[in-house]
Amino acid sequence: MWSYTVEFFRSLDIPVRTLECCSGDLADLKVKSCDIEAWSPRQQKYFEVGSCSNLGDAQSRRLGIRATGDNKYYPHTLNNTVVAPPRMLIAFLENNYNEDGTINIPMVLRPYMGGKETI
């Protein structure tokens, strides 16, 4: 699932990296978590823009979700925050900003912007 988030940001010309969280940094219920971080030219560092987590069966147990097959069981659940809108907008503007005050429009958005290359 995290690859969809990474591809989304890269399609907007935003440099990203993934970071697997250590067990000491995991929130309640999480078995494994991976953060997606975007580059901030202004701050000269990466900042979190998304997260993907495996919660094991803890969430389904709390919610009483059961799956059936050969036996009834609690399914494992996954969570993926693809876009946190304020963070995505910051990353988009910072990475596509030009010195003259214009913003580059990534190729994937140009058909929706009348073919414009900048705004």
Please report, for each region that a protein language model flagged, where it lies by residue.
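TRNA-recognition modules of translation machinery and tRNA-sensing kinases, especially anticodon-binding
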Residues: 1-119
